[in-house]
Amino acid sequence: MTDKIVVAALYKFVSLPDYQALREPLLQTLLDNGIKGTLLLAEEGINGTVSGSRAAIDALLAWFRQDARLADIDHKESYCDEQPFYRTKVKLKKEIVTLGVPGVDPNQRVGTYVEPQDWNALISDPEVLLIDTRNDYEVAIGTFEGAIDPKTKSFREFPEYVKAHFDPSKHKKVAMFCTGGIRCEKASSYMLGEGFEEVYHLKGGILKYLEEVPQEQTKWRGDCFVFDNRVTVRHDLSEGDYDQCHACRNPISVEDRQSEYYSPGVSCPHCWDSLPEKTRESARERQKQIELARARNQPHPIGRDPRQLNEA
């Protein structure tokens, strides 16, 4: 395993009034150790996924341990053969995961953490309302048995869905989950603020569950979407068979790639009839540069991802 790239998903909700001052030393630590990926800093904490050698990730964790506030940062590891990120970034944000509701602060109030080994028993309770807090394209390729899919396009839509579909007086027990634990932790803080009394969330998220719960005992079905070039991981955390459309961000299956509407890097069956021409042209140009760099055995070209045109 020593020659594998270590992919570390990490976050912690913690008060960081000096978060702006942390950016440069954190970025320098990443660069000094050849670590790729993106970390977000905000007054409410830190969040992100990075990758590098075993020694590099250990050096980053050692850097966090120098600050008592970050010493016990939650992190989950998986492995891959190739670097899943192209860039190294540390960004300053208002929120480390954007819910968009003022006053929601997991540093002040949060639901009950549930360890992966206790999760199956909880969600088997018929009185428990099980909610997947991820986006629709993530849920489409894998989720837990019996989970409700809010069909959200972004986490910002989650509060509206809750208000429209759930009632604290009727739904006494709520359990939520997400990829690495951060969205469901923040969602639990929001739900408590809305008057829901028993709110639970999966500690470490789906990734920790897949790491710790034996496959023969799993209640997980499908693959888990991840926010890097692996696109998805299986129950053993190995890379899945999905690719990702660079135009709409949807995961695309082997069957999708056989479609007449699939054009590598440009469009897929999910978006071919809805993409603005500006986005399509940007995607074509980006794909051309990628193929040219590949033919010359050069690094992936650094440029704006056309997906971001729809993410303003």
Swiss-Prot record:
Stretches for region Disordered: 279-312
General function of this protein: Catalyzes oxygen-dependent 5-hydroxyuridine (ho5U) modification at position 34 in tRNAs.
PANTHER family: RHODANESE-LIKE DOMAIN-CONTAINING PROTEIN 7-RELATED (PTHR43268:SF3), THIOSULFATE SULFURTRANSFERASE/RHODANESE-LIKE DOMAIN-CONTAINING PROTEIN 2 (PTHR43268)
SUPFAM superfamilies: Rhodanese/Cell cycle control phosphatase (SSF52821)
Entry annotated with the keyword tRNA processing: yes
Protein name: tRNA uridine(34) hydroxylase
Originating organism: Ectopseudomonas mendocina (strain ymp)
Any one Gene Ontology BP term: tRNA modification
Annotated family: Belongs to the TrhO family.
Compositionally biased spans, kind Basic and acidic residues: 279-294, 302-312
Reaction(s) the record says it catalyses: uridine(34) in tRNA + AH2 + O2 = 5-hydroxyuridine(34) in tRNA + A + H2O
PROSITE patterns in UniProt: RHODANESE_3
Active site: 178 (cysteine persulfide intermediate)
Residue intervals passing through the bilayer: none
Record key words, sorted: Oxidoreductase, tRNA processing
Enzyme class, first EC level, given as a word: oxidoreductase
Keyword Acetylation among record annotations: no
Domain Rhodanese: 124-218
Enzyme Commission numbers on file: 1.14.-.-
GO molecular function ontology, one term from the record: oxidoreductase activity, acting on paired donors, with incorporation or reduction of molecular oxygen
